[in-house]
Amino acid sequence: EDLTLTKNAQPAIMATSIAILKTLEKEGFKIKKSKFVAGHSLGEYTALCASGAISLADAAHILKMRGIFMQEAVSVGVGAMAAILGLNLDNVETLVAEIKDNEICEIANDNEPNQVVLSGHRTAIEKACVKAKSLGAKRAILLPVSAPFHCSLMAPAQENMINLISGLNIEKPIVPLISNVTSIPTQDIEEIRKNLINQITGRVRWRESILFMENSGIQKVYEIG
């Protein structure tokens, strides 16, 4: 049960992914031969750790605090997230514009052409699910998460993360990191630092990140985690 808590789940997921990477390395995989690294949401920290930009200890500490700050940012039950399946990004952006009033309803993850995740106030997200189905979504599913991640409700968590990430020792990654918030690669330390802070409230542009890889000629991807 303790592992389901965000403050414990985040470093645990990262550690599991790094353990898998170490197993692959024993079989001959070399990350320095990769063209890019990328990670979805907290996976971005795993990617940075894997590429030598941050230490395992720092990644675990930052993710634990990230989980605590995210959990504390919004009272339990106030926020929610939902996956919308079967509508593209343009459709969902139109939906969000119609739902938003005095409550938060934002796109948190642009995962693939027909899977977009919303985040915000629970009542707004529930309305969005109903609206999505009326627009032809195959499914609109509330997600079993403890907080509404990657939306402006996470602003208090973002503020708390600024000091932590500002003081984080970051080295130049051995291969470029494709950032969640920009969907383009960088090895610039201050750019990485800024993107990690913006990621707390920002959209995970995963579909665009994968498209960037495809357009860059990537034909083989190692998915770890």
Language-model features: locations:
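Acyltransferase/transacylase module recognition
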Residues: 1-34, 163-224
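Long hydrophobic alpha-helices with heptad-repeat/coiled-coil character
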Residues: 117-120, 125, 212-216, 225
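FabD-like malonyl-/acyl-CoA
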Residues: 1-92, 143, 220-224
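Alpha/beta catalytic cores of group-transfer enzymes, especially the acyltransferase/condensing modules
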Residues: 51-203
